[in-house]
Amino acid sequence: MADLKVSVVSADNEVWSGLAKQIVARTTEGEIGILPGHEPLLAILAAGEVRVTTLEGAVVTANAADGFLSVEHNTVTIVARNAELVK
């Protein structure tokens, strides 16, 4: 199975990047799950959590608002005006 190359960035810095096996994010259409092989997608983020499951199975959580999520060729880019890792 392929991996997802993920970048989560805010307006002023990169919040997290790496390889993942799953992404779950809240969009204006509802919560969406992204797995390797997902069709191309551009979605508007709603305020809420973005959960990234790494290849090792760890879950990285970030709060994100005011942005978008892009999926193309197993590359997921999440750009938000406000984004920060949840400790």
Identify the residue ranges that each predicted region occupies.
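Extreme N-terminus of proteins, especially the signal/transit-peptide cleavage junction
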Residues: 1-3
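Compact, glycine-rich, soluble single-domain proteins
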Residues: 5-87
